[in-house]
């Protein structure tokens, strides 16, 4: 039988045997949780709503539930136990803030048996999830529960200012006392939905010291990998559109500063990656439908509970990376370096660790043996900075240009048309050079040709100019035909010049694929190869 000691150590037992935590079976713990929460939340509904006061954060209510029952409590087949509720009015406010009604809260936790999860970390805690996937119930140590109590006033203030956060959302703190043993539990939001298979799950701290999943962890059906595993598997990171990346990093930065202000460290980002694949989706769609049928009440939805809502809110879908119509189930659309379409589910976990004396000592001796900047235990400010840097540079990356903006498209079209115009001008110059060579052989000078055609002497002190960016941009918007025409006035002058020797064509037409460029001789911009060549203007 698997067991967990007072210090959180897990003792391996035979397969299929029920786990125990502090000498109490998991079934007894689950039953006590459901009975205790059912009584306290139901009793709380009779109390009138009012503003939360400072003393409300330190209130502890207690009720005794004997196995034979009492005037206030039902009979049950578990050992006698006492159930404590910490700050009931404050947590009622938190639940209301996230849109959780008392009936929905009771339905999720008490209507169906709680589902026990395999331990995803090394904390030795037991994890239960409600049948509708809304809530996670986790056992915590005495110091963690005590720290959460002290954290509540600041936590209350932060949630009031910003309910959209990746920090854990605490909905209740309770304690089961039985046989002289205290089992403290906390109810939180569920970060990873069971309805979707997580192809990869990572626990990321931004540290490299011993941050690789153990062999035992890798043998699990759903292993949780660590930082070094991520750098090996996803060495190019995960890619988001610009808006989603900005919202995600702003949320992480704000959350880290909140944790730093409370001197909290050693937290992690729990990251679940679901690879979107048509074959996988079809199979998972059937299984998730079977798993959820009849177990979730219509209309219940915890506000700000999904990863996408936590960073952006319901008004922004951020689905430019995943272009096809997909039910994201609250996941954040992203792409891998291989171009795979992904849904990401994430949340910051394990925040009930303050930088106390033991942590300072732990970092000190680790820093003597290893690089102090690589170990996970560090002072809160440095830990937050390293965590953010790792997330921004190694994990989450921005797709540079999923969709070209109008200004970029205009610049690209101008560049392409300029290059095309250079080729056209070169061809026209070569043709006119041949024509002029014929004129020279018949005795007509270039200087007179320049005077008649251009109406002025050549100016060696003038440097040929190229179109300005403003001219090019304005000309690009006037493109409407698909041919190149030589100005009629210039043709008329040429006809008069060459009437005695050689007749010029009435027009010269050059076909482009997408655009047209008009060349005239009255505006000087581009010069041909010869010093005496005519000066041309390029209009887009």
UniProtKB/Swiss-Prot annotation:
InterPro entries in the record: PInositol-4-P-4/5-kinase_C_sf, PInositol-4-P-4/5-kinase_core, PInositol-4-P-5-kinase_N, PInositol-4/5-P-5/4-kinase
EC number: 2.7.1.68
Class of enzymatic activity (EC top level): transferase
Chief localization: cytoplasm
One example GO MF annotation: 1-phosphatidylinositol-4-phosphate 5-kinase activity
SMART domains, alphabetized: PIPKc (SM00330)
Function: Catalyzes the phosphorylation of phosphatidylinositol 4-phosphate (PtdIns(4)P/PI4P) to form phosphatidylinositol 4,5-bisphosphate (PtdIns(4,5)P2/PIP2), a lipid second messenger that regulates several cellular processes such as signal transduction, vesicle trafficking, actin cytoskeleton dynamics, cell adhesion, and cell motility. PtdIns(4,5)P2 can directly act as a second messenger or can be utilized as a precursor to generate other second messengers: inositol 1,4,5-trisphosphate (IP3), diacylglycerol (DAG) or phosphatidylinositol-3,4,5-trisphosphate (PtdIns(3,4,5)P3/PIP3).
PANTHER family documented for this protein: PHOSPHATIDYLINOSITOL 4-PHOSPHATE 5-KINASE TYPE-1 BETA, PHOSPHATIDYLINOSITOL-4-PHOSPHATE 5-KINASE
Name under which the protein is recorded: Phosphatidylinositol 4-phosphate 5-kinase type-1 beta
UniProt organism field: Gallus gallus (Chicken)
């Amino acid at each position: 039988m698997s067991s967990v000691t007072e210090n959180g150590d897990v003792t391996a037992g035979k397969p299929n045997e029920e786990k125990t935590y502090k000498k109490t079976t998991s079934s007894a713990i689950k039953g006590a949780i459901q009975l205790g929460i059912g009584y306290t939340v139901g009793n709380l509904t009779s109390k009138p709503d009012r503003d939360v006061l400072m003393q409300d954060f330190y209130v502890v209510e207690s009720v005794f539930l004997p196995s034979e029952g009492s005037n206030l409590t039902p009979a049950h087949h578990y050992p006698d136990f006492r159930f404590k509720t910490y700050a009931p009015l404050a947590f009622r406010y938190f639940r209301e803030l996230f849109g959780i009604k008392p009936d929905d809260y009771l339905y999720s936790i008490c209507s169906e048996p709680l589902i026990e999860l395999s331990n995803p970390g090394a904390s030795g805690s037991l994890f239960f999830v409600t049948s509708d996937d809304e809530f996670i119930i986790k056992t915590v140590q005495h110091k963690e529960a005590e720290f959460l109590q002290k954290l509540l006033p600041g936590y209350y203030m932060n949630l009031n200012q910003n309910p959209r956060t990746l920090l854990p959302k605490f909905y209740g703190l309770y304690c089961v006392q039985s046989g002289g043993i205290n089992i403290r539990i906390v109810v939180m939001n569920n970060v990873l939905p069971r309805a979707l298979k997580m192809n990869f799950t990572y626990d990321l701290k931004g540290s490299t010291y011993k941050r690789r999943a153990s062999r035992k962890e890798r043998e699990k059906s759903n292993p949780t990998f660590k930082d070094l595993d991520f750098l090996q598997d996803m060495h190019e990171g995960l890619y988001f559109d610009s808006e989603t990346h900005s919202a995600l990093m702003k949320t992480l930065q704000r959350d880290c500063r909140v944790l730093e202000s409370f001197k909290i460290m050693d937290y992690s980002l729990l990251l679940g990656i679901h690879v979107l694949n048509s074959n996988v989706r079809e199979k998972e769609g059937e299984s998730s439908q079977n798993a959820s049928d009849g177990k979730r009440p219509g209309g219940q939805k915890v506000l700000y509970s999904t990863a996408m809502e936590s960073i952006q809110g319901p008004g922004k879908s951020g689905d430019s990376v995943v272009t096809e119509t997909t039910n994201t189930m609250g996941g954040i659309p992203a792409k891998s370096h291989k171009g795979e379409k992904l849904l990401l589910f994430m949340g910051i976990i394990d925040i009930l660790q303050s930088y106390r004396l033991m942590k300072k000592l732990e970092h000190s001796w680790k820093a003597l043996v290893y690089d102090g900047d690589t170990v996970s235990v560090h002072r809160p400010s440095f830990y937050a900075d390293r965590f953010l840097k790792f997330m921004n540079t190694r994990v989450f990356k921005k797709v540079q240009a999923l969709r070209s903006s109008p200004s970029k498209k205009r610049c690209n079209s101008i560049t392409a048309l300029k290059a095309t115009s250079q080729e056209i001008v070169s061809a026209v110059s070569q043709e006119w050079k041949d024509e002029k060579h014929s004129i020279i052989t018949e005795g007509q000078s270039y200087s007179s040709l320049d005077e008649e055609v251009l109406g002025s002497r050549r100016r060696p002190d003038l440097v040929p100019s190229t179109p300005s960016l403003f001219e090019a941009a304005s000309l690009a918007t006037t493109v409407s035909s698909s041919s190149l025409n030589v100005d009629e006035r210039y043709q008329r002058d040429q006809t008069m010049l060459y009437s005695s020797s050689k007749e010029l064509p009435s027009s010269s037409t050059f076909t482009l694929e997408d655009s047209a460029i008009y060349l005239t001789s009255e505006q000087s911009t581009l010069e041909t190869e010869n010093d005496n060549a005519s000066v041309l203007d390029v209009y887009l």
